Amino acid sequence: MTSASELRSGKTHRDENFPVASWIIHPRHRDLILAFYNFVRTADDIADHEMLDGDTKLEYLDLLEAELLGRGETQPEAVHLRRALAERGMPPRHALDLLTAFRMDVTKLRYEDWDEVIHYCRYSAMPVGRFMLDVHGESTTTWQASDALCAGLQINNHLQDCGKDYRTLNRVYLPRDVLDAAGAKVEDLGLQKSSPALLKCLQGLAVRTASLLGDGRPLAAEIKDYRLGLEVSVIQAYADRIVRMLQTRDPLSERVHLKPIEFVIASFGAMSSEIVRRSFGKGPVSHPAPRA
């Protein structure tokens, strides 16, 4: 088989909508985090590849898993992550969970309700936060807030990309029961502008996601590592801003994203608040709820 590396989209950690191993994170952690990212990005690109059939995608994902577990040396991203984890004495559990999500991307194109979407997030998003916490030696008591934040980020992304996911991959993460309740049809996702019913569905899901992100807001204060706490505060601020935009905008007719200057302002505002909180030993900074 062709190396999975050759199927990469070309997207790197610098192209993501959120920080990945940014300058905020201590340099001693960056190599491992980037090894994890490159493995995950490779698997994600395979699952989303428009020219591969489903069986071939699953074969590649199985190959990445096998080599991550030590059975082979042909896939650079898997071998690099395996060695990086071994150096730190960490198991591959979070990467394996993410492979479960990518297999779901290949085999499951529709979701019946919110609970099914959250179940998907358990494998597609929550392992990323748990991995970062484990890398920094944080307690598993932080997982609850981390899971909420990561799931909120994932659903934000689902809403932002709902049109593209449907048109290019026939993949729909919007719960079927929510579409039905709003009177919307899956086919509406192929339009250049949301129908009133679809817009109602999307904005209602954004409101629900805002509540989920609220459950993640204590995370920065629960984290002991100073730098990771700052990074999480930035990610939370980014997620809150995006979900506010999704409550009032149409992701089919416009790209819902932060401009670079908006991201910089949000980042430094969040870091400043977190620095103040940590300097004075206070509890979580109270941010406005992410509502329109």
Curated annotation (Swiss-Prot):
Pathway: Secondary metabolite biosynthesis; hopanoid biosynthesis. Gene3D superfamilies: Farnesyl Diphosphate Synthase. Disulfide bonds: none annotated. Its EC number is 4.2.3.156. It is an enzyme of class 4 (lyase). Keywords: Lyase. GO terms for biological process: terpenoid biosynthetic process. The keyword Lyase applies. One of its GO terms (molecular function) is squalene synthase [NAD(P)H] activity. It catalyses: presqualene diphosphate + H2O = hydroxysqualene + diphosphate. Involved in the biosynthesis of the hopanoid precursor squalene (SQ) from farnesyl diphosphate (FPP). Catalyzes the second step, the conversion of presqualene diphosphate (PSPP) to hydroxysqualene (HSQ). Belongs to the phytoene/squalene synthase family. HpnC subfamily. This is Hydroxysqualene synthase. The lineage of its organism: Bacteria, Pseudomonadati, Pseudomonadota, Alphaproteobacteria, Hyphomicrobiales. The gene is hpnC.
